[in-house]
């Protein structure tokens, strides 16, 4: 496939780039400067800005998928929403699919009667609430569009550099948590999940999430009948 990646040198974007190259795709890697220290035959580095719809249109022509892994300021604001609008306008004419990598803020907390992650201090401390709210606005912009084939990737609450395990669970609009209540995934497995969706789209105009989830092992309940059976066979 031909893929354009905005934010290709960021924490997430650089790993998506590596994953795409490893899978044999041709990548147009977009940064503000258009330069990178890496040199790979299947990657073309070019300058561009995802906030400018003309740049998005120019860099999505002839591409199968456009992936945006740009970030916004920790204080929040409207930059992510502005970028989402520019991306939608830019790919509308080229018919490329759009995958936007956002944050966990818009996801629903399990067993919470619809409470969003952005409103749960267990996952979003006050110091990053601004950017979490910006991610909610970012998704709202996408949801208003019914013509572009977009996917919003909303990761687990905790993102860390780690290993590429490919052992994670995917879902839609609900936060994935482990048996101890944590929500986490490695940046490397985020790249795997995003590229899986790029290759085999299953979440068109929808949210995709991914995270580690170990099922709680429930103790076996031994009833009177089982006890009698055990006594007979012992």
List each language-model region with its residue ranges.
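Substrate-positioning beta->alpha
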Residues: 134, 182-195, 206
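Short, polar loop motifs at secondary-structure junctions
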Residues: 29-36, 156-157
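Conserved beta-loop-beta element that borders a ligand/cofactor-binding pocket
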Residues: 139-161
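NAD(P)H-binding glycine-rich loop region in Rossmannoid oxidoreductase-like domains
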Residues: 4, 34-94
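Conserved Rossmann-fold NAD(P)-dependent oxidoreductase catalytic core, especially the SDR/UDP-sugar
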Residues: 26, 34, 85-130, 136, ...
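N-terminal Rossmann NAD(P)H-binding glycine-rich loop of SDR-like oxidoreductase domains
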Residues: 3-23
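Glycine/proline-rich active-site loop of Rossmann-fold NAD(P)-dependent oxidoreductases
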Residues: 112, 145-147, 160-167, 197-206
């Amino acid at each position: 496939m031909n893929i354009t990646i905005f934010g290709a040198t960021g924490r997430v974007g650089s790993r998506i780039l590596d994953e795409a190259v490893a899978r044999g795709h041709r990548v147009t890697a977009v940064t503000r400067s258009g330069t990178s220290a890496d040199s790979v035959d299947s990657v073309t580095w070019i300058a561009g800005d995802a906030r400018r719809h003309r740049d998005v249109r120019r860099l999505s022509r002839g591409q199968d998928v456009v992936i945006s892994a740009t970030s916004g300021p920790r204080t929040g604001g409207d930059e992510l929403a502005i970028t989402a609008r520019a991306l939608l306008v830019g790919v509308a004419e080229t018919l490329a699919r759009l995958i936007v990598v956002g944050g966990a803020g818009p996801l629903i907390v399990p067993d919470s009667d619809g409470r969003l992650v952005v409103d749960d201090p267990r996952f979003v401390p006050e110091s990053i609430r601004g950017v979490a709210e910006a991610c909610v606005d970012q998704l709202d912009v996408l949801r208003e569009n019914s013509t572009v084939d977009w996917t919003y990737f909303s990761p687990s609450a905790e993102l860390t550099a780690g290993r590429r395990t490919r052992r994670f669970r995917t879902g839609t609009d609900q936060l994935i948590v482990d048996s101890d209540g944590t929500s986490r995934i490695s940046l490397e497995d985020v790249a795997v999940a995003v590229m899986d969706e790029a290759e085999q789209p299953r979440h068109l105009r929808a949210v995709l999430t991914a995270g580690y989830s170990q099922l709680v092992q429930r103790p076996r309940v031994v009833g009177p009948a089982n006890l009698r059976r055990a006594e007979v066979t012992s």
